[in-house]
């Protein structure tokens, strides 16, 4: 983690910058309280000074460290010239949708100079989640780990000597607000300069012969370490390896997994993967590497992004005897198959007290097939008659079932829903299937041409989907090759979903339903839909409110690969969305300025 020393005076008066646990008696639940001061800071990397946005003078930001059952209270003070919200990524927010922190979906941004208190409970979840800004591209630097520890202190795996967040991100020299504006206008020529591990660029990056600082993990031979690997990047999925070591994957997205041994972890934007690493190598220095993968040409290409850190054994000397330090052998950056096979090998692990929560709904009330890809809308208000195929007459947008989400910059959708005022704001007719079937994974559709041009026209609208309380919903996400062949990390706020199966090619219900895992599927809040493939998920709508569904590639969400699910109230007050809490500021009092 990079601490910015020039911020010291700013925080001299902030006494609540670290967690305050109150009234913990006999293992009872506590109130864990923190203050997030959000501000600008100048940081120098690669011989250039860049203005970034941080919390409490740190990049990444402070860790929220709680125990299952605790109440979390975070006071956010916005010293930025832009509005922002904080999203608690993966927290179920049972009956606390008002605290989800999705900008313009559950709340309006905290205006410059404003404050907001988030208050919610973390019941029934254990493991690694994270938090991040949820307005524009600010999450690139406004983010941090969110750790939920078991109430009884016991794990279904050997207790590690230490646990360490490994936060993979990206270093952007361009101002993040300007980056957002460019992408909104269809300009995707900007790229990060480097990957980062816990805010460090690593010694592969240098300027004028001066190498960048690397993240260093100190270990003692014979001990095990729980690495909480989180991908906060805007653009890329990452491969992560440590030379001379193997991992045992034990959890993901705040849920336990059946232990799975591997020498490499793949983590997509939005995901959090828990792995045990046993320090059993000869004492020395070993490189850890985070390498971004990307589809091969003809997809648009970005520069290779890599960050390199170190695992340093106690007693190991940095001298000529252990140089060069061992390097892990990484896959080719264009080989995305290791990502697919890594996820196919993961299964869920339900503890005895979790059996009910881990029971897959046997029946299905609603089925959706959602295609994920690119399309275009005409510039200048011309709705249909414009030249397609990456023409300057069009803006390229991201779509779900040929609908590109029209992001609002006015009153939050949750307020409209709660007040019963959706007219003229949103409709509830998000399509349950694409408007017309085609060969979704035909690589001939990647380059612009007449084949894909006929499929480009897209509706720009705010079309949501409503579900009754306690309905069983099955979604098949289908990646397409329209103008690109990216994977798609799909994140559903307020829910964990059972990942029943993943596959390559076009989903075929006659063939692929037989592959569904009803016995021990993963529970995830972010599902990586493979490049040129599909993922099938199922969940029970047991959490009333307005819940954002979107791809976690930032360029996809800005381009419109999103919608929201409305879950109706249940039959009792305990199964209904409560009124907004006293600390919730309605949009009229919270500021409406779009950053």
Curated annotation (Swiss-Prot):
<comment type="function">
    <text>Lignin degradation and detoxification of lignin-derived products.</text>
</comment>
<protein>
    <recommendedName>
        <fullName>Putative laccase-18</fullName>
        <ecNumber>1.10.3.2</ecNumber>
    </recommendedName>
</protein>
<feature type="domain" description="Plastocyanin-like 2">
    <location>
        <begin position="162"/>
        <end position="316"/>
    </location>
</feature>
<feature type="binding site">
    <location>
        <position position="87"/>
    </location>
    <ligand>
        <name>Cu cation 1</name>
    </ligand>
</feature>
<feature type="glycosylation site" description="N-linked (GlcNAc...) asparagine">
    <location>
        <position position="470"/>
    </location>
</feature>
<dbReference type="InterPro" id="IPR001117">
    <property type="entry name" value="Cu-oxidase_2nd"/>
</dbReference>
<dbReference type="GO" id="GO:0046274">
    <property type="term" value="P:lignin catabolic process"/>
</dbReference>
<keyword id="KW-0677">Repeat</keyword>
<feature type="binding site">
    <location>
        <position position="556"/>
    </location>
    <ligand>
        <name>Cu cation 4</name>
    </ligand>
</feature>
<feature type="glycosylation site" description="N-linked (GlcNAc...) asparagine">
    <location>
        <position position="48"/>
    </location>
</feature>
<feature type="glycosylation site" description="N-linked (GlcNAc...) asparagine">
    <location>
        <position position="42"/>
    </location>
</feature>
<feature type="binding site">
    <location>
        <position position="493"/>
    </location>
    <ligand>
        <name>Cu cation 3</name>
    </ligand>
</feature>
<feature type="binding site">
    <location>
        <position position="550"/>
    </location>
    <ligand>
        <name>Cu cation 3</name>
    </ligand>
</feature>
<dbReference type="InterPro" id="IPR011706">
    <property type="entry name" value="Cu-oxidase_C"/>
</dbReference>
<dbReference type="InterPro" id="IPR045087">
    <property type="entry name" value="Cu-oxidase_fam"/>
</dbReference>
<feature type="glycosylation site" description="N-linked (GlcNAc...) asparagine">
    <location>
        <position position="439"/>
    </location>
</feature>
<keyword id="KW-0439">Lignin degradation</keyword>
<feature type="binding site">
    <location>
        <position position="488"/>
    </location>
    <ligand>
        <name>Cu cation 4</name>
    </ligand>
</feature>
<dbReference type="GO" id="GO:0005507">
    <property type="term" value="F:copper ion binding"/>
</dbReference>
<keyword id="KW-0186">Copper</keyword>
<dbReference type="InterPro" id="IPR017761">
    <property type="entry name" value="Laccase"/>
</dbReference>
<dbReference type="InterPro" id="IPR011707">
    <property type="entry name" value="Cu-oxidase-like_N"/>
</dbReference>
<dbReference type="InterPro" id="IPR034285">
    <property type="entry name" value="CuRO_2_LCC"/>
</dbReference>
<feature type="binding site">
    <location>
        <position position="551"/>
    </location>
    <ligand>
        <name>Cu cation 4</name>
    </ligand>
</feature>
<feature type="binding site">
    <location>
        <position position="89"/>
    </location>
    <ligand>
        <name>Cu cation 2</name>
    </ligand>
</feature>
<feature type="glycosylation site" description="N-linked (GlcNAc...) asparagine">
    <location>
        <position position="409"/>
    </location>
</feature>
<dbReference type="InterPro" id="IPR008972">
    <property type="entry name" value="Cupredoxin"/>
</dbReference>
<feature type="binding site">
    <location>
        <position position="132"/>
    </location>
    <ligand>
        <name>Cu cation 2</name>
    </ligand>
</feature>
<dbReference type="Pfam" id="PF07732">
    <property type="entry name" value="Cu-oxidase_3"/>
</dbReference>
<dbReference type="Pfam" id="PF00394">
    <property type="entry name" value="Cu-oxidase"/>
</dbReference>
<feature type="binding site">
    <location>
        <position position="561"/>
    </location>
    <ligand>
        <name>Cu cation 4</name>
    </ligand>
</feature>
<feature type="signal peptide">
    <location>
        <begin position="1"/>
        <end position="29"/>
    </location>
</feature>
<feature type="glycosylation site" description="N-linked (GlcNAc...) asparagine">
    <location>
        <position position="402"/>
    </location>
</feature>
<feature type="binding site">
    <location>
        <position position="552"/>
    </location>
    <ligand>
        <name>Cu cation 2</name>
    </ligand>
</feature>
<keyword id="KW-0325">Glycoprotein</keyword>
<dbReference type="InterPro" id="IPR033138">
    <property type="entry name" value="Cu_oxidase_CS"/>
</dbReference>
<keyword id="KW-0732">Signal</keyword>
<feature type="glycosylation site" description="N-linked (GlcNAc...) asparagine">
    <location>
        <position position="206"/>
    </location>
</feature>
<feature type="glycosylation site" description="N-linked (GlcNAc...) asparagine">
    <location>
        <position position="382"/>
    </location>
</feature>
<keyword id="KW-0964">Secreted</keyword>
<dbReference type="InterPro" id="IPR034288">
    <property type="entry name" value="CuRO_1_LCC"/>
</dbReference>
<dbReference type="Pfam" id="PF07731">
    <property type="entry name" value="Cu-oxidase_2"/>
</dbReference>
